[in-house]
């Protein structure tokens, strides 16, 4: 079996390798691919032009005095890569029946496709991290091979990020008499539009569900809408739809990612409550693929470019790599209100 063509790889990754990520599925449903390395923010909506404030990040500190507003932004370039070696094909794979060992050609195919899955997952983690931080804070940090780390700030109003103050903490309220409805309504009123979904971690859910008056108003019999069902598909182990609180869909999320140090961490910090709308106009933007082979094949404006190649030598070496230049854009960060619950 020879090398996979780009068309075969694109077909495989688009149809077989799908990793659903909660915030991307709910709030960033539209995709815009650019033929240029830069993303033109003022061309992605038919409404008010979008701009972002970009600041350098030096030694972990955001230097806003050295930043400026821009409508043209170059995304960080992501290109996870794997090497396949001959020894992997002759050794038994996990799960193989020793009495029915697969031939090396089958193992090679299985390992290559698994590598493609890992590369896709690595890129989705980058996209979801951008999406989550854009929703939580109205900004995120981004880095790439050809530039230093920067902060991309879409201009969230300070009033839309709330920390429960002294005397207002839900953890200190009476479980039998306190009604959180008033607080939730006040929070929702700060959003620039209607709020129809509340996403929270397990800590916030336990607090809310501990209030008798909250439980009495929670409608667990009404099913979730089709959009929400699509978003949480394949995430049943880490995302749970609890019901409706009035018109507010209540969702508990325990989605996680693997950090650079190899430790699994949650996307949502402890005690975080996110109020938003599933009609939010978040956009998945992608800069051009920066690969000469991609250019020769006519694959320039694309969210992904998977490739598979051999290097001639003694011995020859075989690789897979998936390239992407993602930039998650949140035109109206004030559509969301984020509460640090205490």
From Swiss-Prot:
Main location: virion
Assembly with partners or alone: Homomultimer.
Transport among keywords: no
HAMAP family linked: CAPSID_LAMBDA
Pfam family, one: Phage_cap_E
Cited function: Assembles to form an icosahedral capsid with a T=7 symmetry. The icosahedral capsid is about 60 nm in diameter and composed of 415 major capsid proteins. The assembly is primed by the interaction between capsid assembly protease and portal dodecamer, and major capsid proteins assemble cooperatively to form the procapsid with the help of capsid scaffolding protein. Major capsid protein forms hexons and pentons of the icosahedron. Viral genomic DNA is packaged into the procapsid through the portal vertex. The packaging triggers a dramatic reconfiguration of the capsid shell.
GO cellular component terms given for this protein: host cell cytoplasm; T=7 icosahedral viral capsid
Protein name per its UniProtKB record: Major capsid protein
Family membership noted in the UniProt record: Belongs to the lambda phage major capsid protein family.
Keywords: Capsid protein, Host cytoplasm, Late protein, T=7 icosahedral capsid protein, Virion
Organism: Enterobacteria phage P21 (Bacteriophage 21)
Location(s) in or outside the cell: Virion; Host cytoplasm
